[in-house]
Amino acid sequence: SDFICPHPEETTAYIVYLLGHMEKIAAVLGKSEDEKLYKKYAERAKLGYQKLVGTKKFSLDTDRQAKLVRPLYMRLLTEKQTTYAKNRLIKALDNYGWRLGTGFLSTPFILYVLEEMDTEFAYRLLENEQMPGWLFMPKTGADTVWESWEGPKAQGGVASLDHYSK
């Protein structure tokens, strides 16, 4: 929702991510000065991100899967932070019964992150038939992606039944 202000952790992560893409675009276009500038900005923002998640308020010690998946996928962390975030993600998944707990922005990343860690982790999440999860929908009769994990009954039948993919 546009009315919800993003958190500094999310905003900084996407700034680094987008600056990295801008750096690549500048390289393709042969704009070496712009490429250097975007790289410099991305490196500084990445350091800022690493400091931010080192604080208590934005700590990686969380069960919020998105907060762990995002920096792992975007490669925003130090080596020590990466090891911690991977271990913490597995703990978060264990705590949530290996059910999906990411939102729109991080769901596309989670299987890539898990597959890189161990293919079995990715399959374990993907093949979980409990709600919330990808296989819960077809198991309960869906042939499209629902807006709500619970399906049409969750909102009296008015929820989108052909929603942005989760």
Model-predicted segments: where are they?
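Active-site core of glycosidic bond-cleaving carbohydrate-active enzymes
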Residues: 1-166
